[in-house]
Every structure is written in structure tokens, then in C-alpha cells.
Amino acid sequence: MVDLVYGRGITDLIREFPFYLTFFRNIIDIKLFHKKRTLYGSADIINVCNLHCSHCYWWLNREDENNELSAEDWRTIVRNTFKKQRLIGVTLVGGEPTMRPDVIDVFCQEMPGRVCVVTNGTFPLKRFENLYFYWVSLDGTEKVHDSIRGEGSYQKTRDTIMEYISGPSRKGKPAWKDIWITMTINSLNYRTVTDLADEWKDKINKIGFQFHTPFVTGDPLWLPFGETRNEVVDCIISLKKKYPNYI
């Protein structure tokens, strides 16, 4: 199968044509007529996580663990909200979303090929037939990642990824295409951007970078605007030129 757009083949693009048509109409409305349009969605599907990462905002807003929706409740929400607006895609977050495979399955059934799941990768990754991809969080190389997410967490995530990509293809595409890595850059790990990108090159599909957003005044993980941050941006731009289909 030929990949034309981020892992999508010709049959995928034909099937999803109505969504792309709506997407470009919304872009025109936004750019030309300054209308408010929804292009992409996100859903917190679980209020539980097995890690306590030092940079994560979720712990500040944590609610009752028992106050969660059933899979069929989520199906109703998907049909009445996400699908009605013809969103181009949806990202599932938490907590740790892979602890609710029943909900992930509902989203994949209702929005085939348009669902990505953000995960810490410490649990085995299920092969959902209609999943778009997994966003696996790695916050730098092993030592700094473990200082943020807990001792041994990097190796657990690495083992999970390697186990998944050693598995069978899905819809004619090799398993490694399902794995994208995301790194949240902060004051502890910014020096490891290049090393992490090089380490995972030719193992997974893509890697993306974002800067840590401070959620309290004086957040020590915040990388302030200035020379150092600019150097990190320049580094990412250089990596993009070096690995245009990977970064």
C-alpha cells in the first residue's frame, strides 16, 4: 500500500473524502470569513494513571476516579458531538487511555482511521483494527526520562514499543507505522532532543516535539523564551531537514 498522507493510502483518502472536504471548507471559513470552526477533537477518556510524571498538569485537576463514563456513554458522545462536526481526527488522552481499551475501541469503530491515542507506553499496546496511530511519550533519553516519569519507565516503554513493532502488519502496513513518539521538551531534557531522535530513527514512524507548558508560577521545568530555547528550535529545524519524513 502506498502512503500518501501520514500513512494513508489511496483507499483511505477516497473513503475519507467527505471529511477532507469539510476540513477545507472550515479552513476557508476561518481564513476568509473569520468564522469559528472545529477542526480537531480531544477527549479525556479516563481519570486514572499508573505514573506520576513531574511535568503533568493532570494531577492538579484530578477528579473522582469512579466518576467515569461507560463505553456506550462515550459512543453516544462520539455520535452526537465528534461525528456530527465531521472532525478530521480525535486524540484520546487521560490519565492513561490504554487502561480503557473498551472506550478506545468505540472511538475506532465510530471514527475509523481518525483516532490517535496518547500513551506512556508502560502497558502492552492493543492492536485496534481502525486505529490511526499511537502517540508514545518519551521525554528524553533513558536517564532524564526516568527522572521525570519514574525509575525503569523508559525501559518499560521501550519494551512495549519493540514488542508491538515486532508483531504482524495491520491493514497491509507494518506495525512500526503505528508508532509515533512525542517528546515534551523542558529544562531537564532539552539537551537530549537529537540523541532521542537518532536513537529511534528507522525503528518507528515519526517523532514530534512540543515545549512544556508551565501550570504553576515558577515551574522549574519551564524552558524560558530566549537563547537556549531558540537553540533548541534551531536544532529541531535541522533535524527536520535531516529527516524530513521522520520529524
PLM feature spans:
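Conserved alpha-helical substructure of the radical SAM core
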Residues: 2-127
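Radical SAM enzyme [4Fe-4S]-AdoMet core and its adjacent flexible, acidic
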Residues: 1-4, 12, 64, 132-139, ...
